[in-house]
Amino acid sequence: MKKKITFLLMFVLSLSISSAQNTFRFGTSATPEGKTLLVDSKGLILDGKHIIPVMGEIHYSRVPESEWRREIRKMKAGGINIISTYIFWIHHEPEEGKWNWSGNHNLRRFVRICAEENVMLVLRLGPFCHGEVYQGGIPSWVHEKAGQNPKYKIRARTPGFLEDCTKLYNTIFAQVNGLLWKDGGPVVGVQIENESRGPWDYLESLKNIAVKAGFDVPFYTRTGWPALRGKEIFGQLLPLYGDYADGFWDRKLEDMPGSYADAFIMRDKRMSSAIATETFSKEELSEDSPSLSSKLSYPYFTCELGGGMMPAYHRRININGRELKPLVICKLGSGSNLPGYYMYHGGTNPYNPLHTMGETQASPGTNHNDLPHMTYDFQAPLGEVGQVFETPFHEGRFIHQMLTDWGSELLQMNVDSLSRHYARRGAFEFYNDYVRIKNESGTSHVTFKDYRTGGATIDWTTVEPFCKVDDLIYFIEIKGKKPQISVDGKVYTCKLNKQQKAGKLNVCVLSYEKAKTAYKIDGKLLYAKNGGILYKSDSCIVEEVWTKSSVIAATVTEVKKADAPRVVPMGRQAVAAQPVEEDFAKAAVYTINYDTSGMNNYDNLFLRINYRGDVARVYADGRLVADNFWNGKEMWVRMADLVGKKVELKILPLRKDAPVYFQKEQKAMIEATKGDYMLGLDSVEVIERHTLEFNDAF
């Protein structure tokens, strides 16, 4: 009987794989070693087994080349197994024909490191990327061509523009040639364009250009928003979706305007109506692709779940960290089978002496908002300089580990029950009533219901599944609930952090704090002993810990007091305009000094600046290296960019009547300040990153 069941399962799986090959018009799915990666209407199939992977975005050209390997390892420690990255055209070809693929722009080296670290990679090719980059990543010389030739239209199926896109795709492919999945490399997919209305033949032309260039990969994608103009040919490009906890792009200066709260409910609609609302109409963000209701449907994947968010000048969003878990819980409960985060790791824009490399209202393209010139921290789980935002990092990691161990089963389970706060998929129950700002006391969790395992049935739990180690099932407590597991009709109340029997099952419920130290590495559950994060290095386990330096201190001297604050003007897009360089002549100026004598490596040293004001900038020998729009959080600066140079911190005062959105906590700070404006420097600390290495006995 067992042989018959096994044969039947193999037959059904072979039909599924065959269907995937026939349904979607994608590239080579097998490596030279015979590993396969396929797509069907449910999800991804790796070596014949359905999986629910987790994708996280990092931009290599916004992170120092020397940090790539370590930061990729930290992303993997957080549960990321597919990395996505934009290839910003403007970063690589700022002048026509003059390409830069060196240093932080060395795409080939980044891809090789992904291969060496055994993580899959999706390349977002452009030509338009957005990413809060100047002109969305399209170089100025392209805009100049469009201005000189009315037949040359950007992001359109016009000969001149498509010729330049062909050069772009060919040049990108030359950098990754030999590193695709079919070559045994990490590149499993490419995204064509970004947030494009189409029409469809424009996207189809770009895909054909990519394929002709050599991008023969297991799948091709596009963003599933906005609604496309023209009928889509099914199976050419996977639409990937997103949702954000809040949006800097919104025009309104109020808490959670529009439909941001909808990101925190279960729903059967895939398209968010809250992404890029400054660009797209409500109608363009309200229609799912017609193909979704067709007999042959796409799997439900996301590429832009935003637990973090950038502050724009006019909208200073402060992410508290609790937003990420409810977002992914709601998507999984609604049937999604690939969480993809934007951003998972922040970064810093490359310096350009001619203009900012961040989005600005004054540019000819992507000009709806003013973003910082340099910082792109995004309040992500891993921040601009690699600092850990603990709540989203760990709460996301718990779910990602659960998906690693139970994702193959979850993927096979359809949505059986769906309401605003509750969903059930087979043996998994999803619950969320947390809503950013509107219901901060809410909770979010996933639990078992009638789950058959190890010869027993888990009837229900008040704890969340975390991981499996041999025959031991680890759970994590849900705060405020008694930790209980019902097995075969009997209820077991669990002691935290103690292994015990629950009927036929071996279980252990970790406290929330203990779980934050627990990492499953090579089939073992290891614990960080110093409050840091654990990741695997070449020959050992590394614990990374960040502390205030005990050997180096910064001294700050005020050299100029601020002048009266500027009157904040409105920009071209009718929202507040950020200050220009000339405005900083009115800033308070401080010099920052520190003694690093005897040190020859500064890569692990950072300044953490706590200030109050409008905008802060740090200059090294007169060159801008860091900036920050105040939203109540600290500013981070790499000391490697400062050592041996004259360091100046400039802070502009914040007018109380500035036409800028702040959340209630920041509003209270502003209103509590005496006078007409707020300005203060509370601390400048040197933070040191330590890496502690352990052998197998760890």
Where are these regions (language model features)?
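Aromatic-lined ligand-binding clefts that engage carbohydrates, nucleic acids, or primary amines
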Residues: 598-620, 628-629, 650
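Glycine/proline-rich low-complexity spacer/linker segments in large multi-domain proteins
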Residues: 140, 511-531, 538, 546-563, ...
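Active-site region of glycoside hydrolase catalytic domains
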Residues: 118, 130-280, 286-311, 336
